[in-house]
Structure formats: structure tokens, C-alpha cells
Amino acid sequence: MSSLRQSEIKRKTNETDISVLINLDGNGISEIETGIPFLDHMLHQISSHGLFDLKIKAIGDTHIDDHHTNEDVGIALGKAFSKALGERKGISRFGHFFAPLDEALVQVTLDCSGRPHLSYDLQLKAPRIGNYDTELVKEFFIAFVNNSGITLHINQIRGSNSHHIVEACFKAFSRAMRMATEIDLRRSDSIPSSKGMLENQ
């Protein structure tokens, strides 16, 4: 199964040069270098808690700011997930998880439906986490959703520390993605939709 559920995406623009390699049936092994340390840390969470093998290399115009690289990594990773899922046969499709980190608690609910949508409710009081602009968290997920074709709801239940809130968000996201993309043995090779298809619109 793993040989069919992996993909590679290469994306080069005038602003960034990005490669992503993913195996959905992995062991949480990751090699990640985006030039944005906090984003690297969050992407490691996706790999580690989602048990996705993930290799990401990004070169971008971070001498200007992190926006282009952050967004383009979200685009490439979303495309990689969509490509690895293929027709989405046999997957559980839906995923949800509550992740705590100290005082923070975040809920993520998602549907690998082929219908991109993001509802995002994180209240991040700090403008930056280290050197990372906290506005870029939402921008990452917008890019991911639009290119993976998932419906994603992110809800902050409680929390005050921006780092804790964002990390809890990525941990919940990774576990929800793991749940949604895992193979449901009772479905065999059927597509989990009454329409008989799931497509990225």
C-alpha cells in the first residue's frame, strides 16, 4: 500500500524553489529545511504525530520576509497530500482531534472531501513567535487547504501563550490528518462518498 500512497512535488517560481516528498504510510521520519525555523518545527509535528514520512527542502526570498516561502510550502505540501491520496479510495475521509499543550487546547476537524474550505479561529496575541509572524499560520493553512482539497475547521478552545496555541493546532491537525487518511479496511477499494467520487474542485 505504501508504494501507492506517496508522492513528490517540485515547485519553482521566481520567489521560491520547493520540493516535497511524502509517504502517507510512514513512520514519522522527517527531513525539513525551509529557512524558517519555527515553520520547520511545526512541519516536524505534522510528520511525527501524523506518522507521515516527510522530506521538504525550500529555498526562498526570506531575506525579504517569510511570506512567500511559508505560503509556497503550504501549496506544495497540499499538492503532495492530494497526489498521494490519489482517488482517495479506502480512506476514512474524516478526522478530528483535540490537542492540549499546557494551558492551550485546540480542536481540529477535517474532511478529505475534495472541497477546499478553511474555518480558522485562533486568537494569537503575540505578533511574532521568535521571528515568525503569527499571521502566517493562517496563510499556511489557506494554501494547504486550497491545494489539498480538504475542508478544515480549526478552533481554539482555550489558551493564552501563542506558541502553545500554534503548536497544539499543528499537533491536532497532524492527528486528524492521520485519522482521515488511514485506510478503512471495511471500505476496501471503495471511495468514501455516496457520489462515488471525491475530487479536488
Swiss-Prot record:
Major localization listed first in the record, in broad terms: cytoplasm
Catalytic activity from the UniProt record: D-erythro-1-(imidazol-4-yl)glycerol 3-phosphate = 3-(imidazol-4-yl)-2-oxopropyl phosphate + H2O
Keyword Transport: no
Molecular function GO labels: imidazoleglycerol-phosphate dehydratase activity
E.C. designation(s): 4.2.1.19
InterPro entries reported for this sequence: IGPD_sf, ImidazoleglycerolP_deHydtase, ImidazoleglycerP_deHydtase_CS, Ribosomal_Su5_D2-typ_SF
GO cellular component: cytoplasm
Pathway in which this enzyme or protein is active: Amino-acid biosynthesis; L-histidine biosynthesis; L-histidine from 5-phospho-alpha-D-ribose 1-diphosphate: step 6/9
GO biological process: L-histidine biosynthetic process
Enzyme class: lyase
Localisation: Cytoplasm
Keyword S-adenosyl-L-methionine on entry: no
UniProt keyword list: Amino-acid biosynthesis, Cytoplasm, Histidine biosynthesis, Lyase
Source species, domain of life: Bacteria
Family: Belongs to the imidazoleglycerol-phosphate dehydratase family.
Annotated protein name in UniProt: Imidazoleglycerol-phosphate dehydratase
